[in-house]
A protein has these predicted regions:
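An extracytoplasmic/periplasmic, membrane-proximal ligand-sensing/linker region
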Residues: 32-34, 219, 242, 267-328
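N-terminal secretory signal peptides and thylakoid transit peptides that target proteins
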Residues: 1-15
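A ligand-binding cleft/hinge motif common to bilobed small-molecule-binding domains
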Residues: 101-110, 175-179, 206-240
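Hinge/capping helix and adjacent helix->loop/strand transition within the periplasmic-binding protein
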Residues: 85-91, 106-194, 243, 256-289
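Short coil/turn segments
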Residues: 44, 98-99, 135-140, 162-167, ...
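Beta->alpha turn/N-cap motifs
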Residues: 95-100, 104, 162, 192, ...
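N-terminal (or domain-start) structured segment
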Residues: 25-116, 156-157, 182-205, 297-299, ...
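N-terminal signal peptide c-region/cleavage motif recognized by signal peptidases
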Residues: 21-23
Length: 328
């Protein structure tokens, strides 16, 4: 079964969320009514699929339907703002990204919410690797060779494609460039499919982008993967070394997802959500669904999520400032 087929199966299965409880809750206890999971990106993307996986799991466990509501725009800010301004009663949740949690505040003017103060962290859910991939005609076969080639060619003589300014691929390459002492030219595309099309055709020779869409072309030999950006080798491409093991220890630029509630949500509700979601993300059934969606499980309770946000904020603020990316 291909990744696309698995992703479609996940999407279809999650849409068919069961309405009946495995076990009930006493009247008046949380949750006592339908819960809304706001996903700030379009349907059928990875963020949406993870939101549906979490929603389906909670519905099955609690017997109250958790519906997914896609509210797109402004790199996730539209949906995140909706949750930030919702009643803090546990019935409106956010399936957020590293953008809504950390990087958007440095990339957008007039942010409609505070990335930290507007939310109560609930739980981590998953992550995905970026991949540094090249057309086979590119002279480098390893990351050290890529770095050496970029230095030999000179600043901005080597270009790479990614689907967004300030996107996870762009920031991962800026992070690597800062550590390696290179400067590469960023070519912005309107989506990963267009990057991949030009990369396969040789119109552009390099990309840093989320791994899943490129995986089949890497496995077929149509593209060459030089490194993944995750802290450890990726489960679906274990033959591809990490950036960290090729001379940059500690390098980790894996985009991640989480669940949050509006600030002021009662702590007992946050804890109940955190405990249940964390248990789910550790379960074999949910892990399989997350991996079928192209991501990997990243379990962590509300305290772990708060720590993740703090650590990532320090890292990405420094990277964005070094890259001189101005808020738009």
């Amino acid at each position: 079964m291909t990744l696309m087929t698995r992703r479609r199966a996940v999407f279809a299965g999650a849409l068919a969320t069961p309405m009946l409880a495995r076990h009930g809750w006493a009247q008046g206890s949380y949750p006592g009514k339908q819960i809304r999971m706001v996903v700030p990106f379009a349907a059928a993307g990875t963020t949406d699929l993870l939101g549906r996986i979490v929603a389906q799991y909670l519905t099955e466990q609690w017997g109250q339907q958790v519906i997914v509501d896609n509210k797109t725009g402004a790199g996730g800010n539209v949906g995140a703002e909706l949750v930030a301004k919702a009643l803090p009663d546990g019935y409106t949740l956010l399936l957020g990204t590293v953008g809504t949690a950390v990087t958007n505040q440095y990339l957008y003017k007039n942010m409609p919410y505070d990335s930290v103060k507007s939310f109560a962290p609930v739980a981590l859910v998953g992550e995905v690797a970026n991949v540094l991939a090249v057309n086979p005609s590119f002279p480098a076969k390893t990351l050290p060779e890529f770095i050496a080639y970029c230095k030999q060619q000179g600043p901005n003589k080597v270009s790479y494609g990614s689907p967004a300014v300030g996107g996870t691929g762009h920031l991962a390459m800026e992070y690597l460039s800062e550590l390696a002492g290179i400067k590469v030219e960023h070519v912005v595309y309107r989506g990963s499919s267009l990057v991949m099309k030009d990369l396969l055709a040789g119109h552009i020779l390099t990309t840093m982008d989320n791994l899943p869409p490129y995986l089949q072309h890497i496995q077929s030999g149509a593209l060459r993967a030089l490194a993944v950006s995750s802290a450890k080798r990726w489960f679906s491409a274990p033959e591809v070394p990490t950036v960290a093991e090729q001379g940059y220890p500690g390098f980790d630029a894996a985009p991640w997802w989480y669940v949050a509630a509006p600030a002021g949500t009662p702590t007992d509700i946050v804890k109940k959500l955190s405990d249940e979601i964390t248990k789910g993300v550790k379960s074999e059934a949910v892990i399989k669904k997350i991996r079928d969606a192209g991501a990997a499980e990243l379990a962590g309770d509300s305290a772990a999520l708060a720590k993740q946000m703090e650590t990532e904020n320090v890292k990405w603020k420094k990277v964005i400032e070094a890259a001189k990316l101005e808020p738009q």
